[in-house]
């Protein structure tokens, strides 16, 4: 029989928020007796946008903004029904995107 595994991917703009969410997921899963691997930090995506500062004059004057997307990966092994229930009942902050596979 194949071992059951849940892969949790977290994405957020705030690094403190994503780390708190990852720690709460790991703590709730460990209480149910499942094995946890992670949180594994994935590469941070950086999106840069360059805009012109003034609408008419000084066309060479530009300003750059960046948006950083932080990602974490958590693998959960030996999944029990209590583990899935604890993941369903877990309340995470609004700024964190969660994907379960």
UniProtKB/Swiss-Prot annotation:
One Pfam match: Ribosomal_S10
Q: Is this entry keyworded Ribonucleoprotein?
A: yes
Under InterPro entries, the record lists: Ribosomal_uS10, Ribosomal_uS10_CS, Ribosomal_uS10_dom, Ribosomal_uS10_dom_sf
What keywords appear on the UniProt entry? Ribonucleoprotein, Ribosomal protein
For this protein, the record's Gene3D superfamilies field holds:
Ribosomal protein S10 domain (3.30.70.600)
A single GO molecular-function term is: tRNA binding
Matching entries from SUPFAM superfamilies are given as: Ribosomal protein S10 (SSF54999)
Q: Which PROSITE patterns does this entry report, sorted A to Z?
A: RIBOSOMAL_S10 (PS00361)
Q: Does the keyword Aminoacyl-tRNA synthetase apply?
A: no
Q: Name one GO biological process term.
A: translation
GO CC annotation: ribonucleoprotein complex; ribosome
Q: Cite the HAMAP family for this sequence.
A: Ribosomal_uS10 (MF_00508)
Q: What does this protein do?
A: Involved in the binding of tRNA to the ribosomes.
Family affiliation: Belongs to the universal ribosomal protein uS10 family.
Q: Which NCBIfam families match?
A: PRK00596.1 (NF001861), rpsJ_bact (TIGR01049)
Question: Partners and quaternary state?
Answer: Part of the 30S ribosomal subunit.
Q: What is this protein called?
A: Small ribosomal subunit protein uS10
Organism of derivation: Brachyspira hyodysenteriae (strain ATCC 49526 / WA1)
């Amino acid at each position: 029989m194949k071992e059951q595994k849940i892969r949790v991917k977290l994405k957020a703009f705030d690094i403190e928020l994503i780390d708190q969410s990852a720690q709460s997921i790991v703590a709730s899963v460990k209480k149910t007796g499942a094995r946890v691997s992670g949180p594994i930090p994935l590469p941070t995506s950086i999106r840069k946008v360059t805009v012109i500062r003034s609408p008419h004059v000084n066309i060479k004057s530009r300003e750059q903004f960046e948006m950083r997307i932080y990602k974490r990966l958590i693998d959960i092994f030996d999944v029990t029904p209590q583990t899935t229930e604890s993941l369903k009942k877990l309340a995470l902050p609004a700024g964190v995107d969660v994907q379960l596979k």
